[in-house]
Structures are given as structure tokens and as C-alpha cells.
Amino acid sequence: EGEISEEAKFINAVNTITKSNRNFKLESTDGMGFMTDLKNKEIDIAGKNILIVGAGAAVESILFRLVRSEPSKINILNRTKEKALRLCSNYPNHNVEYGCQEDAEYDIIINGSSAGLTGSFNPPKEIIITNKTIFYDLNYSLGKTPFCEWALEFSKSVHDGTGMLVNQAAQSFKLWFGVNPQIDRVLEDLKRLSE
């Protein structure tokens, strides 16, 4: 017998399984890891205009919690329009729409596409970037991802997915062992490795 969390069921993904007595519980900690990382970086979502590039599993895993933080609007761009439209249709009451608004000024730009990992990142031409724009790449690697390299041309507020990875793992650890692990040292070590 098992139980699946509302979040894991909604996003159709599981990354953590716990067992109590004879029952299994299936959960996804990716969204929590993402939101915890934003909180740790003092990035507030409420009332913000957000552009997300990509519509794959990583984006799906964060949207469930992202929309509940009451952004003003979320636009999703993807190479495969149908995939992005399907994702948008999951959130009919949360101002999540396909496409990029003409001359849109976004407070936060999130990259969830694999295009941000190899080669160069080609941003949508319609967006307006200011020195206050925050950039977040759900990808991570040793060194800077192409998305982060591009974003650093405009802003100092550029973040990769390392914090999300570590925070979602910490959440899984807490579910398994009932203990909040200390992650500061892990984050410092990973940052040092990627420089």
C-alpha cells in the first residue's frame, strides 16, 4: 500500500519514497528545494513577472509551488509549443500563459531548457532586461552554464540550480531520517569546485 503526495500526483513525478509501518509515501522535493533556495537568496516571487524558458520535467517540478507564491504573471516559452501549452493548461487560475509578451520587462527569468547546458544560450528577442532582472538556471555544472554566462552580461543576480539540488536533497534527507541536515558546507564546497 502507498500514498502519493498531492504535489507528486499533480506533477506526475516522485523523487523520494518513505515508509512507515507497512505504508509507502511517495513525494517530490524538487519544488520545495527550489523555493527554499529562492528564500535563502532573498528572492521574493510575490507580484513578480516571471519568464520561464523550457517546459520539461524540471520546470514542471517547480511550477506547482511557484504559482502558489502569487507571482503577477508567468510566461512559458518552449521549442515545442504544445508541451508548453499543456503545462500552462494545468494552471488555469494562476495567470500562467504561453509565449513572451512584446517588450515585456521580466523581474525573474528562469531557464529550464537543456539548451542552457551546451553551446550558447539564445534569448527571446522580445524581452527587456534591466539591471534588476534576476536570472535562475535550473541546470548546474562545474563552471558556468551558457545561460549563466549570458545572464552575467546584464546582472550580478545570476544563480544556477546547485542550491535547488542541495535543498531538495536536504528535504529528502529530512523525510527519511527526521533530521534537517546542515547544507552550508556542502554549498560552499560545490561553489568552490565550480569556480
Protein language model features and the residues they cover:
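Phosphate/diphosphate ligand-binding glycine-rich loop within oxidoreductases
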Residues: E1-K41
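Conserved S-adenosyl-L-methionine
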Residues: R68-K73, E153-S157
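Rossmann-like adenosine-cofactor binding region
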Residues: N93-H159
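NAD(P)-binding Rossmann-fold cofactor-contacting core
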Residues: S69-Y91
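Glycine-rich adenosine-cofactor-binding loop
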Residues: S28, G47-V67, N78-R79
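Rossmann-fold NAD(P)-binding glycine/threonine-rich loop
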Residues: K19, G31, I134-I183, L187-D189
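Short helix-loop-beta connector
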Residues: S20, I43-N49, E70, T130-N131
